[in-house]
């Protein structure tokens, strides 16, 4: 007979700097409310994201009835990848009036390759259009 499936009691979504999870907010309160061992998660997350330092890595934590958990790492947010590609700190406050940076279509395709698994696009061209739209809404001009 197959083992029983664990009952899910919660799903937590967080965006944390890679390799820098600690019990302080926002991690501690979010996990503590579900009774999860916070230090155990922090150690596991930091080990899993060690090679992505400098990026914000979204994580989806599934909490089970017995207070155990597992987590799934996502790709960094498109906005963060675009800011890095354009060499900016932040996007424009009025994106359709003030343009703050430029990215090439090659950079857009590279970001689309990275994000493809998290986007609901059938191919790279569709994913690139999604990323280009994000860039425009941040005041970043797409060249090419």
UniProtKB/Swiss-Prot annotation:
Q: Which UniProt keywords apply?
A: Methylation, Ribonucleoprotein, Ribosomal protein, RNA-binding, rRNA-binding
Subunit comment: Part of the ribosomal stalk of the 50S ribosomal subunit. Interacts with L10 and the large rRNA to form the base of the stalk. L10 forms an elongated spine to which L12 dimers bind in a sequential fashion forming a multimeric L10(L12)X complex.
Role: Forms part of the ribosomal stalk which helps the ribosome interact with GTP-bound translation factors.
Q: How is it modified after translation?
A: One or more lysine residues are methylated.
Q: Which PANTHER family match?
A: 60S RIBOSOMAL PROTEIN L12, LARGE RIBOSOMAL SUBUNIT PROTEIN UL11M
Does this entry carry the keyword rRNA-binding? Answer: yes
Q: Name one GO biological process term.
A: translation
Recall the GO molecular function terms of this protein's record: large ribosomal subunit rRNA binding; structural constituent of ribosome
Any keyword Lyase?
Answer: no
Q: Organism's domain of life? A: Bacteria
Instruction: Tell me what this protein is called.
Output: Large ribosomal subunit protein uL11
A single Gene Ontology CC annotation of this entry is:
cytosolic large ribosomal subunit
Q: Which family does it belong to?
A: Belongs to the universal ribosomal protein uL11 family.
Q: Which InterPro entries match?
A: Ribosomal_uL11, Ribosomal_uL11_bac-typ, Ribosomal_uL11_C, Ribosomal_uL11_C_sf, Ribosomal_uL11_CS, Ribosomal_uL11_N, Ribosomal_uL11_N_sf
